[in-house]
């Protein structure tokens, strides 16, 4: 059975035993407030669904996730729960395996998101990095 929720910054699709969460926040799929809220909600739903045996996180467009949304820096949206570290805890504590499908440039918080998953797969054009360390920011 296929179930889909196609509106919003994260698209949820359940195809049989696999839940696919697609970050859909153009142009680079940043971890903006709405994305964090939607990811957390869908992760919790998939973890509670007895029919779901595994979860895949991918990105629409050219990459998985470009990291934090710099437009939210120094704004109240930056502190809205769940914060990125809360998402990492949800990923790591999941009883179901979570796979990050990495493609394109996956940087900063996007790489941290992928590292929080149990498994990672990448296409041959994927690139990863933590550019914030060049500015003295510790991930």
Task: Report residues per predicted region.
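Glycine- (often His-adjacent) and acidic-residue-rich active-site loop
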Residues: 37, 51, 58-90, 106, ...
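Short, small-residue-rich loop/turn micro-motifs
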Residues: 16, 59-61, 68, 124-126, ...
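Glycine-rich beta-to-alpha active-site loop
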Residues: 91-135
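Conserved CoA-thioester-binding segment of acyl-CoA-metabolizing enzymes
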Residues: 1-60, 75, 89
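Hydrophobic/aromatic residues within transmembrane alpha-helices
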Residues: 21, 57, 69, 113-114
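Small-residue-centered hinge/linker elements
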Residues: 27, 136-138
């Amino acid at each position: 059975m296929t179930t889909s929720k196609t509106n919003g910054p994260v698209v949820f699709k359940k195809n049989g035993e696999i839940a696919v969460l697609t970050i859909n926040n153009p142009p680079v799929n940043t971890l903006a407030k709405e994305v964090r809220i939607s990811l957390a909600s869908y992760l919790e739903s998939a973890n509670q669904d007895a029919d779901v045996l595994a979860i895949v996180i991918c990105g629409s467009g050219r990459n998985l996730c470009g990291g934090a949304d710099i437009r939210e820096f120094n704004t109240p949206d930056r502190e809205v729960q769940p914060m990125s570290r809360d998402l990492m805890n949800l990923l790591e504590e999941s009883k179901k395996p979570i796979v990050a499908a990495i493609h394109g440039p996956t940087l900063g918080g996007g790489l941290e998101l992928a590292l929080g998953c149990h498994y990672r797969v990448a296409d041959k054009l994927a690139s990863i990095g933590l550019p914030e360390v060049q500015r003295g920011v510790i991930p």
